[in-house]
Design a protein with these regions (language model features):
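Active-site histidine-anchored catalytic micro-motif
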Residues: 58-127, 133
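Catalytic cores of soluble, metal-dependent hydrolases
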Residues: 1-60, 68-78, 149-151, 155-261
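A general structural motif
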Residues: 117-118, 137-142, 214-218
């Protein structure tokens, strides 16, 4: 809801809500190695139903974790033949059930590439994405099993702890396609500079991966470079976690003058 108000207001774009299980403060089961597998699959399926009913030619997806890119990117791949993905993320998102990490948000790009070990690939309606159709921007150090996945599938990547991919590299990639999808994981931003990201919460552990290193100014430059040189047909903004705003909300909920009739 907060992201909806942060983004520019655009009366030409209809808003559709994907039905997902609301936070209930409870733990879900790990099924077939996937945490809350039934709920994850139900969200993807509902998103696909909306897309197939509305039939948009462009899709903006906001909210949720990285798994929210699966349905729209798969759908748009069924519309556009020449389609590349710019994956702006501190992490590669190619983990599988075999790697022992149960959270599906880390599986999504592997799933879009047709990796069977995600327990989600069977939900795809269209062909898989190929290794040469993916460009990582902002990628930080990766686990050995992720490196193995990328190497075996010939996915080109550069660890960007010291230097991000250049504008020329982005232009070279986007020039090979008629259309581009952008996946933006907010955790690509430096958690020391931007606090509405997973890694700004010291209580969270995840899979041991680290924070992104990008500044807001650099991210803006990257997005401007992409849109100036290609036709963007899909844009995901994932993993925006407004911890400070949540803390304020909890505090204000206990103030009588704000809650009394």
């Amino acid at each position: 809801l907060l992201l909806q108000h942060i983004l520019p207001q655009n009366g030409n774009q209809a808003l559709y809500k994907v039905n997902i299980a609301p936070p209930a403060g409870k733990k879900y089961e790990v099924t077939d190695g996937v945490y809350a597998k039934e709920e994850v699959r139900a969200g993807i399926e509902d998103a696909m139903h909306i897309l197939e009913r509305v039939r948009p030619d462009k899709v903006v997806t906001i909210g949720g974790n990285c798994i929210v890119s699966q349905a729209p990117f798969d759908y748009l791949h069924g519309i556009y033949e020449s389609l590349g993905i710019v994956w702006i993320d501190a992490h590669p998102d190619v983990s599988t059930v075999r790697d022992g990490y149960p959270n599906a948000h880390a599986y999504v790009l592997g799933s879009l590439m047709g990796e069977e070990g995600t327990s989600l690939t069977d939900m795809m309606r269209n062909k898989k994405f190929e290794a040469n159709e993916i460009l990582y921007v902002g990628l930080q150090e990766i686990h050995g099993y992720q490196e193995k996945f990328l190497r075996e599938r010939n996915v080109g990547y550069k660890i960007q702890t010291e230097e991000f991919v250049s504008d020329d590299e982005i232009k070279d990639f986007t020039s090979r396609f008629d259309h581009i999808l952008i996946h933006l994981d907010i955790d690509v931003l430096d958690a020391g500079l931007f606090h509405s990201t997973y890694f700004a919460n010291k209580e969270l552990v995840g899979d041991g991966s680290g924070s992104g290193k990008m500044t807001m100014e650099k991210l803006s430059d990257v997005l401007q470079c992409i849109q100036a040189n290609t036709d963007v047909v899909g844009f995901t903004v994932a993993e925006y976690l407004p911890f400070d705003e949540h803390k304020l909300s909890r505090m204000f909920s206990k103030i009588g003058i704000l809650t009394e009739g």
